[in-house]
A protein has these predicted regions:
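Short Gly/Pro-enriched turn/cap motifs at secondary-structure boundaries
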Residues: 2, 57-59, 271-274
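Hydrophobic cores of alpha-helical transmembrane segments in multi-pass inner/ER membrane proteins
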Residues: 11-22
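Single conserved hydrophobic/aromatic residue that forms the stacking wall/gate
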Residues: 1-11
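Membrane-interfacial segments
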Residues: 21-30, 60-61
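Internal/C-terminal transmembrane anchor helices
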Residues: 31-57
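Soluble catalytic domains of enzymes that build or remodel membrane lipids, polysaccharides, and related
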Residues: 76-286
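Alpha-helical transmembrane signal-anchor/signal-peptide segments
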Residues: 58-74
Length: 286
């Protein structure tokens, strides 16, 4: 299986430039020429530049990162099967920038995937965030379709709702919008992917985060009745892997999102590593 996921990275190759640019400011302000002051000024300039770059430039530099997954349990018919994983669009953060999402959809479709999976957090808070993007996202195409799961933001827990009923209605609307886009939402359930005479199970659980994040997932229910098959699990929060999936199930492969690399990635480094043992890329166990 070839799995591609998209990301937008903060570029680290230009950082030296801004270290040099700090020198004239130092002289102009006539600050004491101590290593401590110089280091502090440089770090401050770098932080501001990186934030601005990531916010306005880096986030639209979509990249496809290809990973090849192999397993003796994977049926032969799935050799070369192509999956594109998308996650954490937080579509409300793209208001006024529909061209970027069109660019993303075109990039995904150009991979000619057999399957597209979306691993949660489609919105920040409300389903109406999709108003300008629903038709665009409906353009995602794959041979076996688009499957999705819910992330912690999709339940609307961080918005001040007038009532619990309003929050519940928002979730219903979000599910309806995904269906209208042609996305097949897996809520603690599974389906089968078929190639020739072979098949594998695609399992999706609702958000199953570590506290304080919400826990709606029901893995035993989602995988009931598919013993012995190769199992591909979609679960939003990567900590679910070590908390339940690894010790209590026979899942072969899990795809997750959620971490965002803590909004900062320089090469292969992200501060996420101090919170999430698995924060980006492929990890093998056993």
């Amino acid at each position: 299986i070839n799995i591609g996921d998209w990301s937008s990275d903060v570029c680290s190759s230009d950082l030296v430039l801004f270290t040099v640019l700090g020198i004239p400011f130092h002289k102009w302000l006539r600050w004491p020429r101590t290593p401590f002051i110089c280091t502090g000024l440089t770090l401050a300039v770098l932080s501001i530049v990186m934030i601005l770059y990531g916010s306005f430039v880096g986030r639209t530099r979509f990249e496809v990162k290809e990973v090849t997954y192999t397993s003796p349990r994977l049926p032969q018919a799935f050799d070369g099967y192509r999956i594109v994983q998308l996650s954490d669009l937080h579509i409300g953060s793209w208001q006024g920038n529909t061209p970027a999402i069109r660019k993303l959809v075109d990039l995904v479709n150009a991979q000619q995937p057999d399957l597209i999976v979306f691993t949660g957090d489609l919105v920040n808070h409300r389903a109406v965030e999709l108003n300008d993007f629903q038709e665009i996202l409906a353009g995602l195409k794959a041979g076996d379709g688009v499957y999705s799961i819910l992330g912690n933001h999709d339940y609307g827990p961080y918005f001040h709702w007038k009532s619990k009923q309003d929050q519940d209605n928002n979730l219903i609307e979000l599910k309806q919008r995904q269906a209208a886009m042609g996305w097949k939402l897996l809520n603690n359930e599974h389906t089968f992917l078929i190639q020739g005479n072979d098949s594998i199970a695609l399992i999706g659980v609702e958000n199953q985060g570590e506290p304080p994040f919400s826990q709606h997932g029901d893995l035993p229910k989602a995988k009931a009745g598919i013993e012995g098959m190769f199992k591909l699990l979609l679960s939003h929060n990567p900590t679910h892997w070590r908390r339940e999936v690894l010790p209590e199930s026979d899942i072969d492969l899990m795809l997750a999102g959620h971490t965002h690399a803590m909004q900062l990635q320089l090469g292969n480094y992200s501060p996420s590593v101090y919170i999430y043992p698995e924060w980006g890329g492929m990890y093998l166990e056993g």
